[in-house]
Amino acid sequence: MPRPPRLAPIPLSMKGSVYSAVLDRLAACPGETYPLHVGDTYLEPATSCRMEDLAVAEHPGMHRYAPPQGIPALVDAVVERLRARTGVPLERANVFVAGGGTSGLACVVGAIVAPEDEVAILAPHWPLIEGHVRMAGGVPVDVPFFGAVDSRESAVAAVETALTPRTVALYVNTPSNPTGHVVPRAWLEGLVDLARRHDLWLLFDEVYEDYVYEGEHVPGLSLAPERSFAVHSCSKAYGMAGNRVGWVAGPAAPVAEALKLSTHTVYAAPTAAQLAALRVLRGPGDAWVEKTRAAYASAGAAAAERLGVPRPHGSTFLFLDVAPRLDGRGLTGFLEDAADRGLAVAPGPSFGPYPTHVRVCYTSAPPDVVRRGIEVLAGLVGR
């Protein structure tokens, strides 16, 4: 008798979209909606760096495949940028252009994580990192960190407690999605020392590096280039999420292995999107970021003040504990009540063991829409 088809176990162990539970309900809302659930921007990319600004006459071959590592001029621009920001003498072999930061990080994880290996993840964390580890057959280990530690010593102790003989890497996202925290230099130096003592890889998710409002962003590569990977994204830096372009940097040998995985999944990042990324790096990108950073900082401060929580130090998010406002339906009921009022926020369990939290993105819609959405949320939490 033939064996019936079956599904592989790894995707069955992974979560689907973190938003699907509320979006159908939101779609049924008859009034204005406030999509504060997704980490995106309402702004268009810089003028001259949009898809409409690219022409075949100027860029013959823009609809053909790019080299798997990336368009050479873009690879060079990334190397130049990273050298300036980190002080590390990187070369082309240390970098590849990915189909977005998400794809790049997945390929790095696939290059360094073997089945049953563990990856310590500072939590709350970006939702998809757990899936990356599971795709490699590894085990994600949440480390309560943001909001749970308050010094270099407690930061190091929190991570060290979570390590086992199977731990191979530590994932650090700063500025943080979802908390808006920026990890201080002294804490990062402590984590680097810990990684060296335990011979761990360091995965630095730095896609919000340009959006720091208080404190400083410390590039991970500048602290431990021999064991660190840094992931960056045009999605967050330059408002190009739909283009799917980012880059990975790290030690040449494992970067080459990660590039193999990228080649066998997306082959290469979209050529036209890479051309737009090159334009933004060589042209108006810095000016766009300066203006955008000021707008984001203002929006974050206003949202935090209205909700009665501390201002974010970076990224584009607030992470709220709504436990006092939950009834017997738990967080699901809170999300349903929000959706019935036109508001979508992201559920806390997507970011780790946070069953009473929600995440708010204060840049995903124009400021007036965000303000009205924050008013709805303030009413729900009794502010």
Where do the language-model regions lie?
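N-terminal small-domain helix-loop-helix segment of the aminotransferase-like
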Residues: 3, 9-100, 107, 280-283, ...
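Helix C-cap/helix->beta junction micro-motif
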Residues: 29, 136, 197-198, 341
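Conserved core of the PLP fold type I
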Residues: 62-193, 210-224, 229, 368-370, ...
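PLP-dependent enzyme catalytic core of the Aspartate aminotransferase-like
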Residues: 80, 160, 340-344, 351-383
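Conserved core segment of the aminotransferase class I/II
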Residues: 226-297
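Conserved glycine-rich beta-strand-loop-beta hairpin in the small C-terminal domain of fold type I
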Residues: 278, 293-304, 309-323, 354
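Short, conserved charged micro-motifs
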Residues: 326-334, 368-372
